[in-house]
Amino acid sequence: MPEDYWSAKDYQRNASFVPKLTKDIVKRINLSSSDELLDLGCGDGVLTNELVSQCRRVVGIDASPDMIKAARELGLNAYVIPGEKLLDASEIPSESFDVVFSNAALHWIMRQPKNRPIVMKGVSRVLRTKGRFVAECGAFGNVSEVVGSIYSILLALGATKEQIDQANPWFFGSEDDYTRMLEEAGFHVEYVENISRPTLLNKDVREWLDTFAQHFYHAFPQWKDIIRETVYNALLVTDCRSDGKWFLQYRRLRFVAHKE
């Protein structure tokens, strides 16, 4: 089990915008009252809980024990299962769901190249024939100003690119990346797009980093404060409006595929 850097309280304080910006992808699930849905990377369960009334059964899984604790406190049926373990997870029977849904999670789950086909096969295993895989995640180019700043700072401080790559917790794939991976796992891709979605932060980019960039802090603890303050000062120019509101340049990859 990977180390758990997540805090449900911090997430709700600094990233409550995440479940609020899901209207478009939730529409594409096209849920019916008879559907059984698995939420892959359910986090604190806030969005998952909104889906409960729309279908027959909802189950959530996530790699973070703290997030699953928060999801269970909402009354959800949720398990600590990393995405790459779904293929063999005894808690989740094969062909037991009509829909696998994932929001803002695949760019974490798919970070390691070796895990990508395993995750896709796991999703296929738990879906019934013609079942749907509907997801939104960080796309190629997502928060590129943040990623570029972090790499530039750490390279200037003496870290190697290989060390930074090892610390980087994200995989922001392209439409072609996901189409290929889905098709190789036996899915038919009905829809895929990469869209721009500038996103208003709850506070400033430092709190965003504290929530989402913990992996860099833990890999380079001696430079945590430098990363935090230098990214803040650099992005004041590009991502902070004159009224003090911060917008990061999010790009989202959305897809709908079904198991053949």
From Swiss-Prot:
InterPro entries: Methyltransf_11, SAM-dependent_MTases_sf
EC code(s) of this entry: 2.1.1.-
Domain of life: Eukaryota
Coiled-coil boundaries: none
Gene Ontology cellular-component terms listed: cytosol; nucleus
Enzyme class: transferase
Gene3D superfamilies: Vaccinia Virus protein VP39
Database matches in Pfam families: Methyltransf_11
Family: Belongs to the methyltransferase superfamily.
Protein name: Uncharacterized methyltransferase C70.08c
